Amino acid sequence: MSKYAGIVLAGGMSSRFGEPKALASWQGGTFIEHILKVMTSTLQEVVVISHSDIKERVEKLVQVPVIEDIPHYKGNGPLAGIVSGMEYIEADWYAIMPCDAPNVSHEWFTILLGQTSNEYDAVVPIINGRKQPLLAAYHNRVKEKIYALLQEEKRSMVQLLSQCNVKYIAGEDVQANADWFINVNTKEEYVQAQKDLSNE
C-alpha cells in the first residue's frame, strides 16, 4: 500500500466550456497531460477517473490507468470519482485534482502532502477566502463516509467536509501562489489563463 496516491477527476463533456476540459490545449499538450506530468513527479501512483464519452481519448494521451466511476454510483459527481479512485489504488492518503486547474505546480503537492497527519481526515486549502475541496487530500478512512453519503443520494463535497476533521491551510505559501488553483470553467477564463501564461 502506498502512503500517497493521486486521483484526477477528468469528467467528460462540459456544457459551460463547450468541450471536454480535460482535452483542452495547454503548453503544447492538454490540461490532463500537464496535470499528470506535475502529479506523477510527486506521486508514484495516480489514476484518472473519466466519463465514458472521453475515456478512450484520454487513454491515448496518458501513461496511467484511466477508469470510470464504480457502476452503481456512476455520474454522482466528484464524490463518486474520488471513491472510485480510492477503490482502485490502496493508499493512506489521496491527493485530489480536478482536470480544470492546469496551472497547478508540483510544489503544491509537496506542500499539501507535507500537511497530512493521522489526526486529520482531510487537508483542504483556502484560496482567497474559499475552501477548495477538490484541490485537497483525503485519508483512506474518508472512503466509508463517502459511501454513506452516496447511499443517501448526497453528492456535495461540503457535506463530506462537514463530517471530517479537516486541516485547512491558508498560509503565505498558498496565498502567494493563488494562480496554482485557478479553475478554467468557460472559454473566456481559458483565454485569460493562456494570456496570463504567456505573460509570465
UniProtKB/Swiss-Prot annotation:
Record GO terms (molecular function): GTP binding; metal ion binding; molybdenum cofactor guanylyltransferase activity
One Pfam short name: NTP_transf_3
Enzyme Commission no: 2.7.7.77
Family: Belongs to the MobA family.
Biological process terms in GO annotation: Mo-molybdopterin cofactor biosynthetic process
Major location (coarse): cytoplasm
GO cellular component annotations of the record: cytoplasm
UniProt entry tagged with the keyword Amino-acid biosynthesis: no
Co-factor requirement: Mg(2+)
Species, as recorded: Bacillus thuringiensis (strain Al Hakam)
Domain of life: Bacteria
Enzyme category, top tier: transferase
Free-text note on domains in this protein's UniProt record: The N-terminal domain determines nucleotide recognition and specific binding, while the C-terminal domain determines the specific binding to the target protein.
TM ranges: none
Full protein name: Probable molybdenum cofactor guanylyltransferase
Role summary: Transfers a GMP moiety from GTP to Mo-molybdopterin (Mo-MPT) cofactor (Moco or molybdenum cofactor) to form Mo-molybdopterin guanine dinucleotide (Mo-MGD) cofactor.
Keywords carried by this UniProt record: Cytoplasm, GTP-binding, Magnesium, Metal-binding, Molybdenum cofactor biosynthesis, Nucleotide-binding, Transferase
Chain positions recorded as Mg(2+) binding sites: D100
Keyword Secreted: no
Residues noted as binding GTP in the record, renumbered to the chain: L9, A10, G11, K21, D69, D100
Catalysis: reaction(s): Mo-molybdopterin + GTP + H(+) = Mo-molybdopterin guanine dinucleotide + diphosphate
InterPro entries membership: MobA-like_NTP_Trfase, Molybde_CF_guanTrfase, Nucleotide-diphossugar_trans
Gene3D superfamilies for the chain: Spore Coat Polysaccharide Biosynthesis Protein SpsA, Chain A
Cell location: Cytoplasm
